[in-house]
From Swiss-Prot:
InterPro entries: ENDOU, EndoU-like, EndoU_C. The active site is at 156, 172, 218. GO terms for molecular function: lyase activity; metal ion binding; RNA binding; RNA endonuclease activity. CDD domains: XendoU (cd21159). Belongs to the ENDOU family. It catalyses: ribonucleotidyl-uridine-RNA = a 5'-end dephospho-uridine-RNA + a 3'-end 2',3'-cyclophospho-ribonucleotide-RNA. The lineage of its organism: Eukaryota, Metazoa, Chordata, Craniata, Vertebrata. PROSITE patterns: ENDOU (PS51959). Monomer. This is Uridylate-specific endoribonuclease B.
């Protein structure tokens, strides 16, 4: 781990410690891991390691909190198919700003903002910082194979997209996963694990998994579970602005994690997600 990685790890630990809206596994939510998913090489597989949903319980009272409410209001604002141009209505733009307003007020984003200002990576004034966040996350761009703006960092990471009608791309958020599973649109296929990754644990806040959505398959994805929208938004913004690398190794709480962050034209987030490396014994 480099000195920069250690510094970032300490900062992410501070974000974690101040994530007051994080849910507690086994208390505020419960998941059912069931079996291991089939090994896919990017193609659908009939084998299903899970006959039941991933989420067996979530205390939805948390969704009444400001950042959760604002986040959830954004999830129905997008066309999932890449190649379908996105049209942002004035109401949707207002919802984007409402979400940013709610996140900027949280302890986690205040910590991230202060650090980014110290590193001269973000403007100090709130208005300028909001504009920076909007550009990184919500400005539309054309994904590979499309000639018109059909994607954004927020849509890809937090909402999910489909490519060619049979492949799910992005979709790295537990709230969207839970809500779509509740509607019957998600079929959880089981957890993913290989020789280099830790065995999954229902009491940990991270999971690699396989699922289908809207007739498409996500052969392998990884997500945080139970964390607040502001924690993920702050974490990924930090990694995007700080790290010239596309994979940054961090250690916080009980986890060694790689945060993958691909830029799009150096201006927007292409994708970003956690990869569990090791669970630390404390």
């Amino acid at each position: 781990m480099t000195e920069g990685d250690r510094e970032l790890s300490a900062l992410i630990q501070e974000l974690w410690d101040n994530d007051t809206n994080r849910l507690r596994p086994g208390i505020d939510y419960r998941i059912s891991l069931q079996g291991k998913a089939g090994d896919l090489a990017g193609v659908p597989d009939d084998s299903d390691g899970a006959g039941m949903p991933l989420f067996s319980f979530v205390d939805e009272n948390i969704f009444k909190k400001e950042t959760f409410l604002a986040f959830i209001s954004l999830l129905d604002n997008y066309e999932s198919d890449t190649g379908e141009p996105e049209i942002v209505t004035p109401e949707e733009e207002m919802e984007n700003h409402r979400f940013l307003d709610s996140v900027i007020k949280t302890p986690t984003m205040k910590i991230a903002h202060k650090y980014l200002v110290e590193k001269r990576l973000s403007p100090e004034d709130t208005t300028g910082f909001k504009q920076q966040l909007y550009k990184i996350w919500f400005e539309l761009y054309a994904r590979k194979g499309s000639s018109k703006p059909d994607s954004s960092g927020f849509e890809h990471v937090f909402v999910g997209e489909t490519r060619g009608g049979h492949t799910v791309i992005g979709f790295h958020n537990w709230i969207q996963l839970y809500l779509q599973e509740k509607l019957g649109h998600i079929d959880y296929k089981g957890y993913s694990v290989n020789a280099n990754s830790p065995q999954p644990d229902e009491n940990k806040h991270m999971l690699a998994l396989q699922f289908s959505w809207k007739n498409g398959i996500k052969p392998k994805g990884s997500i945080f579970i139970g964390v607040s929208p502001e924690f993920e938004f702050s974490l990924y913004t930090l990694c995007f602005l700080m790290s010239p690398n596309e994979r940054v190794k961090v250690s916080f709480n009980l986890y060694d994690v790689e945060i993958v962050c691909h830029h799009y034209n150096q201006k927007h987030i292409g994708t970003t997600y956690p990869v569990p490396v090791k669970y630390l014994n404390v």
